[in-house]
């Protein structure tokens, strides 16, 4: 649970402006938008699958930290005023029997056709990036205006009911002398994935080529930098694929919902 702290009105305005911009058709990755405000991932599954997914998230809190659950027919989250999860992500993915069948920028029609969907909002590692930057650690994909690289790893998640799958990880190249600071900062924020799950040696995670991510864009890795991997909120999409859930809606990786909760509210 986040701490109830005073929010800078300018930050609230920036978050609302970002949501309105997205609602009006902005279609790019959201890293760096409304800096300092929490961003979230999303997965919507049929009511019949909701308990299995809730249990899956509970058993895998580092990759699937649940920040809010919206019952069927509910599209506004307590995490943001004037919100609609059907329009306020820049891009959505539509899944049938574990296969992605479409990508859209407005999901109202699809939600209306599937009124039994239960939605889970999942913490996102974009929410610790401002803290990294404030500590003088460059976040490469923000600097280069690209999407964060994400990979389907060989780390098996704890299954629950009919749902199983492997962890998806995001990667940020960090100078070797700054890794300990990056670990300290992110470890204080378990609700947005917390400390890294792996440092260096991508092959240990089953990643054959770090320059060919499964989701997002490749990041430059300069001399003296080490690839650092965090659990990622795209893990539910890997579970959808592996478990052949009959229908689901998710965000597109890197295209997040921006809340009214400051990042620092999650710091322990």
UniProtKB/Swiss-Prot annotation:
Keyword Nucleotide-binding: no
InterPro entries: D-Glu_cyclase, Putative_hydro-lyase, UPF0317
Pfam families attached to this UniProt entry: D-Glu_cyclase (PF07286)
Keywords, comma-separated and alphabetical: Lyase
Enzyme Commission number(s) from the entry: 4.2.1.-
GO molecular function ontology, one term from the record: lyase activity
Domain of life according to the entry: Bacteria
Enzyme class of the recorded protein, top EC level: lyase
SUPFAM superfamilies: PSTPO5379-like (SSF160920)
UniProt-listed HAMAP family: Hydro_lyase
NCBIfam families: PRK05463.1 (NF003969)
Family of the protein in this entry: Belongs to the D-glutamate cyclase family.
Listed name of the protein: Putative hydro-lyase ABAYE2440
Organism of this sequence: Acinetobacter baumannii (strain AYE)
């Amino acid at each position: 649970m986040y701490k109830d702290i005073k929010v800078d009105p300018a930050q609230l305005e920036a978050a609302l402006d970002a949501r309105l911009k997205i609602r009006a058709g902005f279609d790019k990755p959201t890293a760096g938008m409304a800096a300092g405000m929490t961003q979230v991932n999303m997965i919507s599954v049929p009511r019949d699958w909701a308990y299995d997914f809730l249990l899956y998230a509970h058993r895998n809190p580092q990759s699937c930290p649940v920040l809010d659950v919206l019952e069927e027919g509910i599209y506004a989250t307590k995490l943001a005023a004037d919100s609609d999860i059907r329009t306020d992500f820049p891009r959505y993915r539509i899944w049938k029997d574990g296969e992605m069948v479409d990508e859209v920028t407005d999901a109202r029609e699809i939600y209306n056709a599937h009124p039994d969907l239960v939605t889970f909002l999942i913490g996102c590692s974009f929410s610790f990036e401002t803290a990294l930057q404030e500590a003088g650690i460059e976040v490469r994909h923000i600097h280069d205006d690209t999407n964060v690289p994400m990979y389907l790893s060989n780390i098996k998640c704890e299954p629950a009911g009919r749902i199983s799958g492997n962890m998806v990880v995001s990667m940020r190249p960090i100078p070797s002398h700054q890794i300990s600071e990056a670990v300290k900062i992110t470890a204080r924020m378990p609700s947005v994935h917390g400390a890294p799950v792996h440092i260096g040696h991508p092959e240990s995670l089953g990643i054959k080529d770090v320059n060919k991510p499964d989701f997002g864009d490749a990041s430059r890795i300069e001399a003296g930098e080490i690839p650092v991997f965090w659990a990622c909120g795209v893990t539910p999409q890997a579970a959808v694929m592996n478990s052949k859930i009959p229908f689901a809606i998710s965000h597109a990786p890197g295209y997040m919902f921006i809340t009214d909760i400051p990042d620092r509210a999650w710091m322990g």
